[in-house]
Amino acid sequence: MHRTIWRYFAVGLFVVGVAASLAGQQAPNDPSPLMLPGHRYDLPATPITAAQIEAHKKNMIAAKNDDVPMNMVKAGGGSDKHQVGVSVVNRNKGQKNPNYAVHDDVAEVYYVVEGKGRMKLGGKISDWKRRPVSAGNGRGSAGTTAVGARDVTIAKGDVLIIPAGTPHKWEDAEQFTSYVVVRVDPDGVAPLMELGTAKFTGAN
């Protein structure tokens, strides 16, 4: 009888001790941010102004470029490969892309700053072809036909998220359209690039 009571008492103390330990881990007394071993927390922020984006867009128009990265930086966290960058893309009125693009590694977030147009998104590409590594998009493939792709219209103020591996192409620009693209590169495939070092060297 006494042995049974002491056994339950010991188990109870053990459970209370484990619970207290977990509670201490979940709610530490130290209010500073959690610093995990092997993670980077010393990277600087990169402000990009509206004036810089506008100047970049105008340089692209003058050089007849349609997609030029502004920068690509280390994103920190648990992998030194993880990167994030910003590009500007311009589409002239009536411009269409003959091919779908699919990025192996890089996800994209579009923010439309001017104009309106239609895109084809998703589906299954039947005529895959590998393409050269892009400065902004890294590795990827292209194709002309995507079964099941859907039409999406994007306009000024809209945001569009395109995960890596999702086919997409510009179907028709109803007017001159410009959008900022945030590109997330988890494997560090695209080259790093400092803000202000963009090259405008003819149509992409």
Task: Enumerate the language-model features and the residues they cover.
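A short hydrophobic beta-strand segment most commonly corresponding to one strand
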Residues: 175-193
